[in-house]
Each structure stands twice: as structure tokens, then as C-alpha cells.
Amino acid sequence: MKNLLDLSYEELVTEITNLGLERYRADQILDWVFDKKVNNFDEMTNLSKKHRALLKEHFSISFLKLLDKKVSRIDGTTKFLWELEDGNTIESVMLFHPDRITACISTQVGCPVKCIFCATGMSGFVRNLTTGEIVAQILSMEKEEKKKIGNVVYMGMGEPLLNYENTIKSIRILNHKKMGNIGIRRITISTVGIPDRIIQLAEEGLDVKLALSLHAPTNFKRDQLVPLNKKYSIEEILNAVKIYQRKTGNRVTIEYVLIRGINDEISDAKKLAEILRNMKVFVNLIPVNPTVEGLRRPSRERLLTFKRILLENGIEAEIRREKGTDIEAACGQLRLKRIKSRS
């Protein structure tokens, strides 16, 4: 049985017409699923009982089972722990801004990259999410909170470009006007840097935003923070980003988690400005999550100094305003606690 959320618009039309239903029925089904958040064919009352029975024979509509939810008392940021059909768990986060609601979603169960400051990597890698499981995070959050998500960041558990096909297909579904209907420039992919996939992304014709999780200005330091750097060097990654920018014309966000005594030195700021010179970038400076054992945040003074050095060297930069600090909103924390409690 196929999960309807795995299907593109064109695939759904083909599937239902092959079953003998009219093409326009696809739009009716999608209205129920994406607009009304209905995942039961029996509730689709503008379809005949015969059609509903036929659809139930061939398709499921797999929303996610909510295991846990944490809501920030500070800013309303909401973190969800979901159970998948095979018993694995993933996390998603809903962030509230005055003018929009942003969802941070996962692409893998666990993560193979194992950045030292990330809780997701501590629990290991299990598998890629299906297209439907990625899409279902948006629908399940919207159904749970009864709110419409306007922005999506692929910054949750996992490395999106290591689950490339399912990530790209989910973006097309979320962007399609008869499905997720989320503007393409309101969707961001965050990656630690998979050079060939960054170049491939430039060829997709998808005008999504790209964020690169860099975290260090030299290979020596990045090897320690992001083990995958031993496979793909900073030079290879930035070269791929330059190709991406030539093809798309888009500015790229550079994510930089600052850790006291590791990558927050004045020399690091100067080196970062040097390697990013003449690139169309914006640097997001992120104090390390204090819940990660053994890692400490830089002082406020050091954060401001780091930012000032970048600005003085012509690199746009900002210190990210944190959300959900009281609920450890960074993805991976809830899942890791659940795994530890069962071991």
C-alpha cells in the first residue's frame, strides 16, 4: 500500500486515473489532506463511498504519532517528538515570529555526520526518512497546533543532502500550490557541505535558500568539530558553493556555532573573513548550546568582537537570537533522552 504523502502531484493524478477516478479527484483529495489535515478517506465526504473504499484499498495517509511535546514559556517555541510506523523517533520544532511561523524539520533518523556539539549525532544514524515522513512533519504540526506554517528550514535531525532524492521531492510537494503551497524562497536547506550535491542542487531549478554549517575557518579545526570534513575539505565545499552561486545568483547563509576556546579566537574571525571574501554570504553566529556536555559559550564580549571583525572585513554577520532555550529546542535532545531512559 502506498503512502499518499510520498507522491508528487503528477504521480497522484496518474495513480487515481489508473484506478478509474477522474483527474479532478486528485485536487479534492489534496484539499482534504493539505488544507483540512484529514488523513482518513472516510471523512472525505465529497467522494462517493465507492471511491473512498477504492482509495482505502490502495493508499494510506500516514501522519505522525505524537509521543511528546515541549512548549517554551519564553516565546512559545514548540518541540515535537514523533513516532514513525517502524517505531523509530524523530523531532520537529515550530518557531513563532510576529509575521510568520517557521518549522524546523528532520530528514533522517539520527545523523551520520556526528558534529560534536549536536545531540542528534550522539544517538547514531539509523536510516533516511521517506518523502512522506518529511512532509508528514509539516502536516502533523499544523494539525496539532491548528496553525499554518509559512516557512520551512531543513535544519532538524540529519543531513538533508545525504537523503537527497527524498529531500528534493519533499520540497517540491511542500512548494506545490495544490499541496503544501509554501513559497520556494521560504524554504531553506541546511547542510554541512556535500560538494557534489550542492552543485546538483544548483541544477534542480529550485530557488530554495541554502545554509552552510561551516563552524570553523580551517580544516584542522573543522576536522575536530565536523568529522565529515576529513572527507570534504573546506576548499572543496566553498568551491561548490561558488559554483552554486554562479548558477543561482543566491546569497548563502554561513552557520557558525561559536565554542569557547575552540573556534572563537580573533584569529578565527580574521581567517573566516578571509576565506569568505568576495562571496555573497551572510554569517549567522550561534553560541553553542549550553546543554552539550563539556562545551562552553564565548562571553558576550567575545561574540561581539567576533561579529565586529567580520563586519570590518566586509562580511555581513549577526548573532542569532535564540528561541526555546528553556526547552532545549535544538533537535535531538528529546530523542536522546528517550533513548538513554530505555537503555
UniProtKB/Swiss-Prot annotation:
<feature type="domain" description="Radical SAM core">
    <location>
        <begin position="97"/>
        <end position="326"/>
    </location>
</feature>
<keyword id="KW-0004">4Fe-4S</keyword>
<feature type="binding site">
    <location>
        <position position="289"/>
    </location>
    <ligand>
        <name>S-adenosyl-L-methionine</name>
    </ligand>
</feature>
<dbReference type="GO" id="GO:0005737">
    <property type="term" value="C:cytoplasm"/>
</dbReference>
<keyword id="KW-0698">rRNA processing</keyword>
<keyword id="KW-0479">Metal-binding</keyword>
<feature type="binding site">
    <location>
        <position position="190"/>
    </location>
    <ligand>
        <name>S-adenosyl-L-methionine</name>
    </ligand>
</feature>
<keyword id="KW-1015">Disulfide bond</keyword>
<keyword id="KW-0411">Iron-sulfur</keyword>
<protein>
    <recommendedName>
        <fullName>Probable dual-specificity RNA methyltransferase RlmN</fullName>
        <ecNumber>2.1.1.192</ecNumber>
    </recommendedName>
</protein>
<dbReference type="GO" id="GO:0046872">
    <property type="term" value="F:metal ion binding"/>
</dbReference>
<keyword id="KW-0489">Methyltransferase</keyword>
<feature type="active site" description="S-methylcysteine intermediate">
    <location>
        <position position="331"/>
    </location>
</feature>
<keyword id="KW-0819">tRNA processing</keyword>
<dbReference type="GO" id="GO:0000049">
    <property type="term" value="F:tRNA binding"/>
</dbReference>
<dbReference type="GO" id="GO:0002935">
    <property type="term" value="F:tRNA (adenine(37)-C2)-methyltransferase activity"/>
</dbReference>
<dbReference type="InterPro" id="IPR006638">
    <property type="entry name" value="Elp3/MiaA/NifB-like_rSAM"/>
</dbReference>
<dbReference type="GO" id="GO:0019843">
    <property type="term" value="F:rRNA binding"/>
</dbReference>
<dbReference type="InterPro" id="IPR004383">
    <property type="entry name" value="rRNA_lsu_MTrfase_RlmN/Cfr"/>
</dbReference>
<comment type="function">
    <text>Specifically methylates position 2 of adenine 2503 in 23S rRNA and position 2 of adenine 37 in tRNAs.</text>
</comment>
<dbReference type="GO" id="GO:0051539">
    <property type="term" value="F:4 iron, 4 sulfur cluster binding"/>
</dbReference>
<dbReference type="GO" id="GO:0070040">
    <property type="term" value="F:rRNA (adenine(2503)-C2-)-methyltransferase activity"/>
</dbReference>
<dbReference type="InterPro" id="IPR040072">
    <property type="entry name" value="Methyltransferase_A"/>
</dbReference>
<dbReference type="GO" id="GO:0070475">
    <property type="term" value="P:rRNA base methylation"/>
</dbReference>
<keyword id="KW-0808">Transferase</keyword>
<dbReference type="Pfam" id="PF04055">
    <property type="entry name" value="Radical_SAM"/>
</dbReference>
<feature type="binding site">
    <location>
        <position position="118"/>
    </location>
    <ligand>
        <name>[4Fe-4S] cluster</name>
    </ligand>
</feature>
<feature type="disulfide bond" description="(transient)">
    <location>
        <begin position="104"/>
        <end position="331"/>
    </location>
</feature>
<dbReference type="InterPro" id="IPR048641">
    <property type="entry name" value="RlmN_N"/>
</dbReference>
<dbReference type="InterPro" id="IPR013785">
    <property type="entry name" value="Aldolase_TIM"/>
</dbReference>
<feature type="binding site">
    <location>
        <position position="111"/>
    </location>
    <ligand>
        <name>[4Fe-4S] cluster</name>
    </ligand>
</feature>
<feature type="active site" description="Proton acceptor">
    <location>
        <position position="91"/>
    </location>
</feature>
<keyword id="KW-0963">Cytoplasm</keyword>
<feature type="binding site">
    <location>
        <position position="115"/>
    </location>
    <ligand>
        <name>[4Fe-4S] cluster</name>
    </ligand>
</feature>
<dbReference type="InterPro" id="IPR027492">
    <property type="entry name" value="RNA_MTrfase_RlmN"/>
</dbReference>
<keyword id="KW-0408">Iron</keyword>
<keyword id="KW-0949">S-adenosyl-L-methionine</keyword>
<dbReference type="InterPro" id="IPR007197">
    <property type="entry name" value="rSAM"/>
</dbReference>
<feature type="binding site">
    <location>
        <begin position="158"/>
        <end position="159"/>
    </location>
    <ligand>
        <name>S-adenosyl-L-methionine</name>
    </ligand>
</feature>
<feature type="binding site">
    <location>
        <begin position="213"/>
        <end position="215"/>
    </location>
    <ligand>
        <name>S-adenosyl-L-methionine</name>
    </ligand>
</feature>
<dbReference type="GO" id="GO:0030488">
    <property type="term" value="P:tRNA methylation"/>
</dbReference>
<comment type="similarity">
    <text>Belongs to the radical SAM superfamily. RlmN family.</text>
</comment>
